[in-house]
Amino acid sequence: MSDVAAFTAYPVIAIDGPTASGKGTVAHQIADLLGFHYLDSGSLYRLVAFVSIRENIDDHDVNSLVRIASELDVRFKADHIWLKGEDVSLALRHESVGNQASAIAVHGPVREALRARQRAFLEAPGLVADGRDMGTVIFPEAVLKVFLTASVQARAERRYKQLIAKGFSATVESLSRDLEARDLRDRTRSVAPLRPAEAARLLDSSDMSVDEVVAQVLDWYRQVQGVKAR
């Protein structure tokens, strides 16, 4: 099936937003509730970052990074990510990997190398995709585009709780600085900068629970599908 036909046949919900905005948790829950496939696009960049760190490759060595992106032997199963048969799920959550991924994501050739892999996730009955450019670049014809954000303080506190729960050491202050730096890099990069897609629904989750955000996105999706059905 062609990309155009797939877009017509299978609905896509694209959820974009900055680091630690909660988009991954929300997207995963919505995919489960709808029975859709789920794409965590950030994990692909983290995988490239993880391999580059392991192979001691500089984040400016674009040719080597493209090679890594093109050769990723990855498998997603439940909440686990397997790289060449190795469960790297926990390792990918480390802040050093996230910072490297953000630096790598500025390179157009790397993004292009991962483009086809991301689009391949679009299968029946539908897809929920989260990332930085799902609604603007990868799935521009998504039936629902959401830009999910939150204050730096709220995001730093969420990230802190996640890292501590996984056994990593961190402070809210250092995480806030990292988030501000990554936000700036994501917004100002020349290729696919972080921004709301045209017609995206904007949602600030600073003072919302995960359940409240999920309910809002599902309500928007039902509205969109209702409009399509008429």
Swiss-Prot record:
Gene Ontology CC entries for this record: cytosol
Binding site for ATP: 17-25
Subcellular compartments: Cytoplasm
An example molecular function term from Gene Ontology annotations: CMP kinase activity
Enzyme Commission (EC) number: 2.7.4.25
Keyword ATP-binding carried by entry: yes
Entry keywords, A to Z: ATP-binding, Cytoplasm, Kinase, Nucleotide-binding, Transferase
Reaction catalysis annotation: CMP + ATP = CDP + ADP; dCMP + ATP = dCDP + ADP
Domain of life of the native organism: Bacteria
One Gene Ontology biological process: pyrimidine nucleotide metabolic process
InterPro entries listed in its UniProt record: Cytidylate_kin (IPR003136), Cytidylate_kinase_dom (IPR011994), P-loop_NTPase (IPR027417)
Family annotation (PANTHER family): CYTIDYLATE KINASE, CYTIDYLATE KINASE/PANTOATE-BETA-ALANINE LIGASE
Family: Belongs to the cytidylate kinase family. Type 1 subfamily.
Descriptive protein name: Cytidylate kinase
Protein species of origin: Ralstonia nicotianae (strain ATCC BAA-1114 / GMI1000)
